[in-house]
Amino acid sequence: MKYHHGNLKEELISSACKICEANGHAHMSLRSIAKEANVSQTAPYRHFKTKEDLLAEVSKKGFEKLGEILNQASCQNDNMTAKERFIEMGFAYVKFGLERRNTYDLMHSPIIDKVEFPELLEAASAAFDELIKIIAELNPGISDTDLSRQCIRHWAQVHGLVDLVGDAKI
């Protein structure tokens, strides 16, 4: 067991991400995370007051990764049309949700009150902003209201597809 750790907080978050993805957030505990990080059972409490604090960090990392993946999909090829990049973003979103199903479920779980975690809310918003940018590019001059409606509609479609395919309903 390690008693001195370079960046304990990041190591704990990394361990929590691994456990979440392997077993789901319901099977995570601060004790299991400490064991995965090879630190004392009390070490996580130095950085996280509650399990929810740590879950919020795991969720934030998931949204950051999703935003990065969506950005890459929308910028992957300058020769692609906006519509083609939009379609690639949809595929990337579904792939992320299916390949990282446990993290994805946590990201969209009501177990974490995003309002209580501004950095998590910011990461989630940044990922959604990737969709806003491409929809706005596809629809020059679109009103804010219509842009919002289209974004929610398209997000609901890919989100629903992840849930249906992930739950083997289709």
List the predicted regions and their residue ranges.
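N-terminal intrinsically disordered/low-complexity leader segments
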Residues: 1-7
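Hydrophobic alpha-helical connector segments
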Residues: 57, 71-99, 141-142, 150-154
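Hydrophobic alpha-helical segments that form the core
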Residues: 132, 144-167
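Amphipathic alpha-helical packing segments from all-alpha helical-bundle domains
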Residues: 71, 108, 115-141, 148-152
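Amphipathic alpha-helical segments used for helix-helix packing
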Residues: 98-115, 163-170
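Alpha-helical DNA-contacting segments of helix-turn-helix folds
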Residues: 20, 55-62, 70, 107, ...
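Helix-turn-helix
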Residues: 11, 15, 22-53
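Generic hydrophobic, amphipathic alpha-helix propensity
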Residues: 8-17, 33, 58-66, 70
